[in-house]
């Protein structure tokens, strides 16, 4: 039997996930994003990135199955991590290129559930965005997922583990993980575009520098903002979901209040 306090926490988590998702889906504003748009990549590159991504997706599906099988109580936290990534990556500001830039929101889930599982959540986020709010596309889903749902989570996790070894406060490790995952994701996106469209004069290096410079104008401030937001959300989780985090052993006991 679920205790009233547990029921309250579950209801709170479910309400946050439902409310934040509905706010984005119901938004009437047109959505432009720095995900690679539908049909933008040449066919060879689109197929190539799909082939590179599929093994990580298969690994993620297995990881998700194991997570739910071993820790069924974590389903709502998994849903919350997915909803958080969906909402945060749907927040957009104009970029100097005439498109928009946005954070990725993938670091929190990577820290909670490890990078393989985030390949599934990140792909679902990108799929819903491409179908519901015109972010990205289906042909470019492989490239977008490889950068946001594979490279982003692994960078977040490795950064978090590395910074945590310095025995700093968890907030610093969380901020660093979120910041690096953002910058790394869009660095790879810049490389993907540069590989597909090398500069006619300077080649790959010049094209990469151009894309990276344009992305950095808006992405670095957004990476800082997401890092701060991730810390705030983590503080909320360690206040209202202490029992769940302890039961799942998602983080060392001493990092919980």
UniProtKB/Swiss-Prot annotation:
It comes from Thermosynechococcus vestitus (strain NIES-2133 / IAM M-273 / BP-1). Part of the energy-coupling factor (ECF) transporter complex CbiMNOQ involved in cobalt import. HAMAP family: CbiM. Forms an energy-coupling factor (ECF) transporter complex composed of an ATP-binding protein (A component, CbiO), a transmembrane protein (T component, CbiQ) and 2 possible substrate-capture proteins (S components, CbiM and CbiN) of unknown stoichimetry. Pathway: Cofactor biosynthesis; adenosylcobalamin biosynthesis. Keywords: Cell inner membrane, Cell membrane, Cobalamin biosynthesis, Cobalt, Cobalt transport, Ion transport, Membrane, Signal, Transmembrane, Transmembrane helix, Transport. The keyword Cell inner membrane applies. Residues 1-33 form the signal peptide. It holds the Pfam family CbiM. Belongs to the CbiM family. One of its GO terms (biological process) is cobalamin biosynthetic process. The keyword S-adenosyl-L-methionine does not apply. One of its GO terms (cellular component) is ATP-binding cassette (ABC) transporter complex. It comes from the Bacteria. GO terms for molecular function: cobalt ion transmembrane transporter activity. InterPro entries: CbiM (IPR018024), CbiM/NikMN (IPR002751). It is a multi-pass membrane protein. Its main location: membrane. This is Cobalt transport protein CbiM. It is found in: Cell inner membrane. The chain crosses the membrane at residues 39-59, 74-94, 117-137, 138-158, 171-191, 214-234.
């Amino acid at each position: 039997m679920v205790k009233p306090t547990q029921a309250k926490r579950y209801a709170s988590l479910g309400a946050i996930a439902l409310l934040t998702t509905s706010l984005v889906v119901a938004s009437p504003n047109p959505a432009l994003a720095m995900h690679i748009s539908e049909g933008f990549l040449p066919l060879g590159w689109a197929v190539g990135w799909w082939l590179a991504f599929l093994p990580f997706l298969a690994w993620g599906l297995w990881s998700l199955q194991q997570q739910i099988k071993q820790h069924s109580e974590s389903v709502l936290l998994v849903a919350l991590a997915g909803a958080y990534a969906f909402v945060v990556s749907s927040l957009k500001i104009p970029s100097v290129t005439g498109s928009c830039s946005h954070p990725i929101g993938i670091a929190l889930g990577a820290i909670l559930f490890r990078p393989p599982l985030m390949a599934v959540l990140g792909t679902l986020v990108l799929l819903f965005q491409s179908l519901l709010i015109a972010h990205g596309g289906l042909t470019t889903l492989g490239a977008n997922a490889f950068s946001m749902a594979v490279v982003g989570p692994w960078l977040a996790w490795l950064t978090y583990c590395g910074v945590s070894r310095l025995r700093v406060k968890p907030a610093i490790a969380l901020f660093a993980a979120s910041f690096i995952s953002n910058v790394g994701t869009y660095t790879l996106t810049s490389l993907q575009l540069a590989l597909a469209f090398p500069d006619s004069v300077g080649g790959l290096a010049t094209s990469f520098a151009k894309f990276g410079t344009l992305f950095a104008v808006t992405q670095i401030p957004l990476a800082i903002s997401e890092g701060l937001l991730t810390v705030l959300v983590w503080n909320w989780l360690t206040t209202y979901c202490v029992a769940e985090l302890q039961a799942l052993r998602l983080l060392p006991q001493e990092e919980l209040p």
